[in-house]
UniProtKB/Swiss-Prot annotation:
Organismal lineage: Eukaryota, Metazoa, Chordata, Craniata, Vertebrata
Compartment(s) where it occurs, according to its Swiss-Prot or TrEMBL record: Nucleus, Nucleolus; Nucleus; Chromosome
InterPro entries, alphabetized: G-protein_beta_WD-40_rep, Glutamate-rich_WD_repeat, Histone-bd_RBBP4-like_N, WD40/YVTN_repeat-like_dom_sf, WD40_repeat_CS, WD40_repeat_dom_sf, WD40_rpt
GO cellular component entries: chromosome; nucleolus; nucleus
Originating gene: GRWD1
Phosphothreonine modifications at: 10
Function: Histone binding-protein that regulates chromatin dynamics and minichromosome maintenance (MCM) loading at replication origins, possibly by promoting chromatin openness.
Keyword Repeat: yes
Modified residues (Phosphoserine): 122, 344
Protein's name according to its UniProt entry: Glutamate-rich WD repeat-containing protein 1
Length: 446
């Protein structure tokens, strides 16, 4: 959440903000700041962060930016709210040269909450205590890297029993599976990490690779119900099914699922049915498939014009029969799969003013979701929210008339946002990746 520097206060969506003239000091007309819509910044103004709008906020950089990452479930427990937090990420870089790319395991720890400003009139002794406290509160990052030839388009992590693995889509047109157990071990042990970086990292290779796609791709999803079952989709409109075999390998069906006419952008397995998945494409469609049918006949349902242009991302709710989609048109759409044949979403939200790059339902709260866009916004939403008619905000401030009432929070400050994920074990914690690096935060709204 940001505010205009030099103005009285920040505001959340739907809350008015009084402005003060820099020349006269007099109060101007109350306004709502809407990112991407105005009012535009005047000369000498800039946006500043309102730390009181965040429970937690940290940033990290890893050298080359990462186009994709996934959160690795850990053994530290579920529903963790006590600070400081520890979390693990698996990410892949997009370096300037193919030889400079890395698959990485990150351990972020000692992640404290935002600290309230010191009270006015605090003495020197209190300031010294604050400096010592700041040192103890510094966030920490451990990083284990594996060389990878080619930029990494997408990373998705799954557990095969007790074995964590990462599916990796390469810009070189190959999909690989890497075992992650050793990487998880070394980021927890500084001595083991030093040994790994010195002696082991250059020797670490994928445990399986598939080069049968006709080019590069981005779509990839592990089944949440059948361990090891994987889908991969490419920019040539093809989707392939991976089936795990004995001995830790995979059989990849060479017959692609037929239906899309352009690049397959995203894939999502059903969280309730073993054989059903959804796909979206640059052909503007969303399709529902059943792998029990032959690949040429497996498409069961189609919404041909789901968005006005490319459908970039989809996410299947684990709590409701809802599919969330985001497109090049900047729209966010919620589809009730019980009514998917109608071809109409049950809700459409238009806050983003550039293509949507990532969407995800909250893992614990069925009506809450987050989205990121090429407009450098991360938005948080709640389908259950309705505007209070007695509040009268829309009448008193015309800027609220077009503001979606389900919009909870707008986060800014990143550059070229690519992907976000809710942490499945730390309620309300969001992680994003962008050209500007990683951000871990939790807002006061979720």
């Amino acid at each position: 959440m940001a505010a205009l520097k030099g103005r009285r206060r920040t505001c959340e969506p739907g809350e008015s903000m009084e402005t003060e003239s820099q020349e006269t000091g007099s109060k101007g007309q109350a306004q709502v700041y809407l990112p991407g819509r105005g009012p535009p910044l005047r000369e000498g103004e800039e946006l500043v962060m309102d730390e009181e709008a965040y429970v937690l906020y940290h940033r990290a950089q890893t050298g080359a930016p990462c186009l994709s990452f996934d959160i690795v479930r850990d053994h530290l427990g579920d529903n963790r709210t006590e600070l400081p937090l520890t979390l693990y990420l698996c990410a892949g870089t997009q370096a300037e040269s193919s030889q400079s790319n890395r698959l990485m395991m990150l351990r972020m720890h000692n992640l404290h909450g935002t600290k309230p400003p010191p009270p006015e009139g605090s003495d020197d002794e209190e300031e010294e205590d604050d400096e010592e406290d700041e040192e103890e509160r510094k966030p920490q990052l451990e990083l284990a890297m594996v060389p990878h030839y080619g930029g990494i388009n997408r990373v998705r992590v799954s557990w095969l029993g007790e074995e964590p693995v990462a599916g990796v889509w390469s810009e070189k047109g190959q999909v690989e599976v890497f075992a992650l157990r050793r990487l998880l071990q070394v980021v927890d042990d500084p001595q083991a990490l030093a040994t790994f970086l010195r002696d082991e990292q250059t020797r670490m290779k994928p445990i399986f690779a598939f080069s049968g796609h006709m080019g590069e791709g981005f779509a990839l999803d592990w089944s949440p119900r059948v361990p090891g079952r994987l889908l991969t989709g490419d920019c040539q409109k093809n989707i392939h099914l991976w089936t795990p075999t004995d001995g830790g390998s995979w059989h990849v069906d060479q017959r692609p699922f037929v239906g899309h006419t352009r690049s397959v952008e995203d894939l999502q397995w059903s969280p309730t049915e073993d054989t059903v998945f959804a796909s979206c494409s640059a052909d503007a469609s969303i399709r529902i498939w059943d792998i029990r049918a032959a690949p040429s006949k497996a498409c069961m349902l189609t919404t041909a014009t789901a968005h006005d242009g490319d459908v970039n991302v989809i996410n299947w709710s684990h709590r409701e029969p809802f599919l969330l989609s985001g497109g090049d048109d900047g729209a966010l759409k919620v589809w009730d799969l019980r009514q998917f044949k109608s071809g109409s979403p049950v809700a459409t939200f238009k806050q983003h003013v550039a293509p949507v790059t990532s969407v995800e339902w909250h893992p614990q709260d069925s009506g809450v979701f987050a989205a990121s866009g090429a407009d450098n916004q991360i938005t948080q939403w709640d389908l259950a929210v309705e505007r209070d008619p007695e509040a009268g905000d829309a009448e008193t401030d015309p800027g609220l008339a077009d503001l979606p009432q389900q919009l909870l929070f707008v986060h800014q400050g990143e550059t070229d946002l690519k992907e976000l994920h809710w942490h499945p074990q730390c309620p309300g914690v969001l992680v994003s990746t962008a050209l500007s690096g990683f951000t871990v935060f939790r807002t006061i709204s979720v």
